[in-house]
């Protein structure tokens, strides 16, 4: 017997607030990440999970939550087949938007070079890197979980587990090394949706829990599940210690980035060397530990990274659910950007492009902070203007 649920409002305050916080976090880390004075924890890294790296999984968590919340309404309103068809068309539209927003680098300088490359080789760099960023991953992941979006929690969790196992297998076959060879993939590349489905499906589960009557809201369960996911993600990342370089081989391997057998370590690599560093703690440099599948890597979309980040996203959302839906607190800045997240995402790259050319990488902290404030102010002006004129971009 399924648990009783309550109808949620058209817009859930906690979800908008959570999304707005995530948008502002994205503004921060995307703007400051290239400056020398900024702490490493605010920068994106390819070999561990920093604060910057937990931002994108929160978007996928919010996508899964909203998808679960709105799709059933659409089915009830339009019928099953029209609802599925409409979602597929909207996801195709989002994929097209992502291709336009991200663009692509030119694969050839002359017509002859383009003809010699052929269509597949010409499109390969864009498919591997340029197009598969946040918006495309949202579209691909949403399409991937669409068959189970109406299923029970158990089915969805099994689907997430199967997707994770498939990602490990394909990474062992080719995908991990492919993502880390030029041109390097972004956010897991074309197969990243397999592990991005983890935070998305946890978002759908959170939606089910929030829909329970107040007296049955499983606060403890949400906190325990978020903690378990974070611990499991960190535990999986401890496999990275198999790839510590012995002291006598550091000089020999100092220029090598990727480990031998980066997914399934060979027998002589299976030596216990202790636990991995905690998330948000920088690991040893590549001369001391080679890159491998078990480290937390946004570039490769690794299992440990997205399992930990799914738990972290759930814990952050629980905070907003309590503060906003139970205590009835609401923060205007989070509401502003949370209700118009897509246009905020598209605009922020343009605004950064107008400001950052005038901020050298080695600028002092006061100059970086001032330019960051200018960036936030311009974004606020643009998005506030759109809100006042009731202009919202949603797909």
Segments the model singles out, each with a brief description of its role:
Residues 1-395:
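Alpha-helical transmembrane segments and their immediate juxtamembrane cytosolic regions
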């Amino acid at each position: 017997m399924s648990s009783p649920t309550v109808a949620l409002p058209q817009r859930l305050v906690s979800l908008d607030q959570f999304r707005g916080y995530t948008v502002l976090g994205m503004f921060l880390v995307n703007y400051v990440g290239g400056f020398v004075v900024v702490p490493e924890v605010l920068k994106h890294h390819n070999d561990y999970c920093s604060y910057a790296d937990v931002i994108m999984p929160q978007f996928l968590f919010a996508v899964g939550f909203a998808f679960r919340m709105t799709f059933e309404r659409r089915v009830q309103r339009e019928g099953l087949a029209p609802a599925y068809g409409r979602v597929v068309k909207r996801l195709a539209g989002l994929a097209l938007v992502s291709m336009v927003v991200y663009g692509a680098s030119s694969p050839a300088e002359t017509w002859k070079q383009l003809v010699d490359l052929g269509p597949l080789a010409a499109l390969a760099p864009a498919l591997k890197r340029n197009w598969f960023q946040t918006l495309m991953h949202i579209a691909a992941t949403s399409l991937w979980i669409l068959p189970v979006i109406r299923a029970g929690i158990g089915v969805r969790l099994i689907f997430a587990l199967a997707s994770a196992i498939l990602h490990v297998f394909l990474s062992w076959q080719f995908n991990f090394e492919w993502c880390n060879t030029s041109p390097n993939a972004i956010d897991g590349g074309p197969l990243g949706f397999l592990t991005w489905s983890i935070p998305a499906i946890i978002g759908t589960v959170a939606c089910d829990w929030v829909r329970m009557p107040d007296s049955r809201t499983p606060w403890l369960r949400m906190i325990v599940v978020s903690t378990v996911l974070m611990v499991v993600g960190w535990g999986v990342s401890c496999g990275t210690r198999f790839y510590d370089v012995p002291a006598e081989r550091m000089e020999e391997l100092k220029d090598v980035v990727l480990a031998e057998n980066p997914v399934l370590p060979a027998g002589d690599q299976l030596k216990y060397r202790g636990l991995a560093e905690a998330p948000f703690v920088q690991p040893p440099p590549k001369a001391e530990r080679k890159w491998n599948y078990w480290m937390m890597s946004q570039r490769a979309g690794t299992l440990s990274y997205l399992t930990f980040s799914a738990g972290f996203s759930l814990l952050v959302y629980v905070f907003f659910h309590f503060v906003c839906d139970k205590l009835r607190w609401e923060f205007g800045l989070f509401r502003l950007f949370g209700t118009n997240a897509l246009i905020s995402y598209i605009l922020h790259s343009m605004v950064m492009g107008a400001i950052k050319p005038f901020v050298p990488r080695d600028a002092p902290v006061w100059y970086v902070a001032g330019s960051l404030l200018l960036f936030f102010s311009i974004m606020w002006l643009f998005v506030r203007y759109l809100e006042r004129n009731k202009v919202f971009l949603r797909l």
